[in-house]
């Protein structure tokens, strides 16, 4: 297990080294979020999937394998992030996921809430004593996962469920952070988003089962 001091030292080095790309990714995420909210469609889907594919690959390889390497990131984070990256890339052609704000007002509000928290990650960490460069910026692996969960949960039922499922383990594994692991309490946001994502995934799964049961008698009646 990586020590708390070593973790935050490596975060600081990563920020000081990679800040131009980290800032560019944050701006790109903000602009693409605007498109999802106000101009959803095929072009927005394409650009968002391409961005997410790159962001997950970058974090999986550069952040986990090079900058903040430890057993958990190497053997759990890397495979999960690379798989998610590949699935977003594949979905550019498959077109299973369509990003947009949900119709229900409560769910729309939650989507905005989660994405706002992503961009507020550094501010959440500030009163906890995490100031730049030793702070988690919006497109770090954990806030990026929150960002993706919010987007795919909003897209339900028009979503590749494999992506949805693969996003959840990394989020739910953040529970120890809520009890002081690595002095990274801001990742309680990540854990909470994982719980939210799991609830939405189960709700969608149940809704699909109910719809399938209701459709079966109709099909039998037509066939008969």
Protein language model annotation of sequence segments:
Residues 74-148:
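Membrane-proximal helix-loop-helix units in multi-pass membrane proteins
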Residues 1-69:
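N-terminal topogenic module of multi-pass integral membrane proteins
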Residues 73-78, 180-194:
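Loop-to-transmembrane alpha-helix initiation sites
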Residues 54-62, 113-124, 168-180:
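Aromatic-anchored segments of alpha-helical transmembrane domains
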Residues 41-53, 102-111, 156-167:
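Membrane-interfacial loop-to-transmembrane alpha-helix junctions, especially the N-terminal start
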Residues 20-33, 79-95, 143-155, 189-206:
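Hydrophobic cores of alpha-helical transmembrane segments in multi-pass inner/ER membrane proteins
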Residues 38, 93-99, 201-218:
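Membrane-interface capping segments at transmembrane-helix boundaries
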Residues 66-69, 153-165, 171-187:
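Membrane-helix boundary connector in multi-pass membrane proteins
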